[in-house]
Regions:
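Membrane-interface junctions at transmembrane-helix termini in multi-pass inner-membrane proteins
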Residues: 137-160, 185, 345-376, 416-418
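Specific pore-lining/lateral-gate transmembrane helices of multi-pass inner-membrane transport
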Residues: 73-95, 262-374
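Membrane-proximal transmembrane or re-entrant/amphipathic helices at the cytosolic face
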Residues: 443-492
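Small-residue-rich midsections of specific transmembrane alpha-helices
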Residues: 18, 24-28, 47-76, 97, ...
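Interhelical loop/hinge segments that connect adjacent transmembrane helices in multipass membrane
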Residues: 1-7, 184-188, 200-239, 283, ...
């Protein structure tokens, strides 16, 4: 329980930078959807370009974030030697990412003409140049950020993340509201400024590192990381392939960016699941490797999975139930796509479960399994998108995510229970999923059938959510076990 409380504490701190940060970034969605007219397709351009940058970031980091945790954790070393060892791991990882980043920048700036023509940005190659610089700096920042997580410096981590977000929001408000800009150019330009500033703030941390490159360690790292790279590529394609493929396969090319803008803006509401999963990952990943030698590790992993699902399902219900209010996050022109939000959220939950399941092969250094699972899910997603986007548009994108993540999740669970079984509480998990489905149907059916107004709908849906919370408190999380307020409910 102490370890789980520590996990919850770290998740809360990382969540400050992830969940609160993303929530603050929601302020940019109404900003963009108000100042960028739907007909311009500029929001679709932003969605498309950021999809490419997400994929490139995975390529440049080369699975080295997880590799850093795997190689830096060594309980046999004394604290002093352990620090030198972890610095050597960090140095070697940075050498890999730095080399890949330099090669990437040389290729982009050397062949910007053909690249911009191929991707449909011949008129605006500067979009790609700015975002190439952004993703290069993001890749170089990713390893120091991971090192902060390894060192359990959660406050420093969260502070830098939140500073970036504050700068980004402030500059966007200045350019779009004060100066009245309407072009997507300024979205990329502001990102470049903010990313560059945060990169400079890492200089003091980098100066404290005892730099030492280990060639022998690098060989073992690459052997460990390349399946993670494949896993990462397949995983990120599951997240962004729809946004990359959409302009390529949608029959009306002139309308493609408009439709993609609608989908991209509505997906922002569903991204609360990505926030929770990311915050949980930041806290959980270092702990998993550190706890891998403990006798109670399987029980811990099973409990972590259960509580992850409980809170993501609660978040799902909150978003679905409070949609009459949350819809105002995006501009009125873009709200026609709100129906995809629950579908995308379900896909994100599956992705989170898949992430939790993935540790069985990481802990036994069989990361190749993850590569195969993610590749299978990616192929399913590609097939659904390519076949159905021409007919069903962005609805195919949403269901493609469910199909892709669902495939990877099921494969990982089935193989994992044979190779490295973990006693997940499947009956309890099934109850929570069934209750979530029932309450979701109730919140959609009853207000629509009886023509509730927005206020009455919010009250009714909130009562449904309270039913779910009541079940949690009764079954798995009694008030007496909660931090801070728990002491008031414990028996004397």
């Amino acid at each position: 329980m102490a370890n789980l409380k520590g996990l919850m504490k770290d998740t809360a701190i990382y969540g400050l930078s992830s969940i609160v940060g993303r929530f603050l970034n929601y302020l940019l969605v109404p900003l963009y959807t108000h100042y960028m007219p739907k007909a311009s397709g500029d929001y679709g351009v932003s969605t498309n370009v950021y999809a490419y940058t997400a994929l490139i970031l995975v390529l440049l980091t080369f699975g080295m974030e997880t590799t850093l945790f795997r190689f830096a954790n060594d309980d046999r070393l004394t604290p002093e030697i352990g620090r030198k060892h972890s610095d050597t791991v960090f140095s070697t990882v940075m050498a890999v990412v730095g080399t890949l980043t330099v090669v990437f920048l040389l290729l982009v700036f050397g062949f910007i003409g053909p690249i911009s023509n191929t991707l449909g940005y011949a008129a605006h190659p500067e979009y790609l140049q700015m975002m190439a610089a952004v993703v290069a700096m993001d890749a170089l920042q990713a390893i120091p950020f991971s090192y902060l997580r390894y060192q359990k410096r959660a406050i420093r981590f969260a502070s830098l993340k939140l500073l970036f977000i504050a700068l980004n929001i402030g500059l966007n408000v200045f350019y779009f509201v004060v100066l009245g800009k309407t072009s997507v150019y300024y979205v990329f330009f502001i990102n470049l400024l903010c990313t560059g500033f945060i990169s400079l703030l890492f200089i003091p941390d980098l100066l404290k590192v005892h730099w030492h490159f280990d060639g022998q360690m690098l060989k073992r790292m690459l052997s460990y990381s390349w399946p993670i790279l494949i896993l990462g590529i397949a995983g990120i394609l599951n997240q962004v392939a729809d946004k990359i493929l959409f302009p390529l396969v949608y029959p009306d090319q002139a309308q493609a960016n408009v439709e993609l803008g609608i989908y991209g803006s509505c997906v922002k509401i569903a991204m609360i699941m990505a926030m929770i999963t990311q915050a949980f990952r930041y806290a959980y990943e270092p702990i998993v490797f550190a706890k891998s030698k403990d006798a109670d590790k399987t029980e811990y992993y099973a409990s972590a999975m259960k509580y992850f699902l409980i809170f993501t399902l609660l978040a799902f219900l909150c978003v679905v139930g409070w949609m009459p209010l949350l819809q105002y996050i995006i501009g009125e022109e873009y709200r026609e796509g709100l129906g995809v939000v629950p579908i995308v959220m379900a896909a994100e939950i599956m992705m989170g479960v898949y992430f939790n399941l993935s540790f069985w092969y990481k802990l036994i250094d069989k990361t190749i399994y993850g590569a195969w699972f993610s590749l299978a899910g990616c192929l399913v997603l590609f097939a659904v998108n390519i076949i159905f986007i021409p007919k069903y548009g962005y609805w195919a994108c949403a269901w493609g995510g469910v199909a892709g993540y669902g495939t990877a999740m099921v494969l990982s669970y089935m193989v994992g229970q044979k190779k490295n079984p973990i006693p997940y509480p499947m009956r309890s998990i099934a109850y929570y999923v069934a209750l979530t489905v029932m309450l979701t149907l109730t919140m959609n059916y009853v207000p629509a059938t009886y023509h509730f107004g927005s206020v009455v709908t919010l009250i009714f849906n909130s009562l449904c959510i309270c039913c779910f919370v009541s079940y949690i408190l009764q079954s798995d999380l009694p008030l007496s076990s909660l931090p801070i307020i728990g002491k008031y409910f414990r028996k004397k």
